[in-house]
Every structure is written in C-alpha cells, then in structure tokens.
C-alpha cells in the first residue's frame, strides 16, 4: 500500500503538467464549422453560408456589453473599409435581445453582417472567451490569423488581416 501511495504522489504532478492548456482554436487553426440561430429564430447561418475568398471576423459579444456596443459602432462607422470582410456576430443571449441590438444599430442593411445566437454554446469554449467582445480573425483562405479581446480599432484589425 505504501508503494502505491508513493507512486501516486510521484506521478500526480507529472499528470498535472501533461494537461492540455491550449484553446481549441489554436489546435485547429482554420475556421471551424459552426451554426448560429438567426434573429428570426427559425433559420440558421453556418460557415457554409459565408462568401468564399474573403476574410472572416467572428465576434463573440453580448448585446448588453458596452465594449461590444462600441465595437459594433466602430464597425458600422467604418463599413466602407469592412465591405469585403464577413462579420459573424454570435452571442448566447436570447433572440429578442439580438433583434433589438440589430434594430438599434441598423445591422440589416449590411449584407456582410451575420448575427445570431450560439444555441450549442460552441464558440465560448472553443475560443475560451474571457473578455467581450472577442474578435477571431481568419484570412481569405479561412486560416486563423489572431484573436483580439476587448474593443479593437478597425485599422488594427485590417492591419492584421493584410
């Protein structure tokens, strides 16, 4: 019994060090398959619906988050710079909050904005979100570029996507 206890105490720290600390997006550096429930609460938007050959921004947000609102405002004010980028905005909040958010920022008029609810709670664990908004950037070939947490200037995003 003492030998078992001794072996257990010796190998427990080794097993703890062997734990995987990398977020899934770092292990799988291409745009993941996803689906979000759109604000009409009946249709889905998936990664297959994105325009091919253009960069993608995945934005994890909350309609109640001030920084998320500032980021959305920065996007809409700089829409001419962002027209050739697909922007997927995902939240875990209820659809009615998404609907109100879309109306407030008039997001329906932008064809490159896709807003919905992550009903499968895929994105949070995939990116290990700590701060909102989280912006995950992918190039035109759908390869991972970088992640920004917190509101980020549009020019900094565009520089990263060059």
Specify the residue positions occupied by each region the protein language model found:
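Bacterial Sec-dependent N-terminal signal peptides
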Residues: 1-23
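Short active-site neighborhood of thiol/selenol oxidoreductases, capturing the structured segment around
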Residues: 46-69, 75
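N-terminal "domain-start" segment that seeds a small globular fold
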Residues: 19-48
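Structural microenvironment flanking redox-active thiols in thiol-disulfide oxidoreductases
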Residues: 69-107, 122-125
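Thiol-/selenol-based redox modules, centered on thioredoxin-like
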Residues: 54, 131, 137-162
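Solvent-exposed coil/turn segments that connect beta secondary-structure elements
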Residues: 63, 92-94, 120, 140-141
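Short, internal strand/loop/helix patches
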Residues: 105-136
């Amino acid at each position: 019994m003492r030998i078992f206890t001794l072996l257990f105490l010796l190998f427990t720290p080794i097993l703890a060090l062997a734990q995987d600390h990398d977020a899934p997006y770092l292990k799988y550096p291409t745009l993941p398959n996803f689906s979000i429930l759109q604000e009409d609460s009946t249709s889905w938007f998936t990664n297959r619906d994105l325009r091919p050959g253009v960069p993608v921004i995945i934005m994890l947000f909350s309609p109640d988050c001030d920084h998320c609102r500032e980021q959305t405002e920065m996007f809409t004010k700089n829409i001419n710079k962002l027209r050739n980028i697909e922007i997927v905005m995902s939240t875990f909040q209820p659809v009615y909050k998404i609907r109100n958010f879309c109306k407030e920022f008039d997001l329906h008029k932008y064809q490159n904005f896709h807003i919905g609810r992550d009903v499968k709670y895929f994105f949070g664990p995939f990116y290990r979100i700590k701060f909102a908004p989280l912006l995950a950037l992918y190039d035109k070939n759908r390869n991972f570029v970088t992640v920004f947490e917190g509101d980020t200037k549009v020019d900094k995003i565009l520089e990263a996507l060059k």
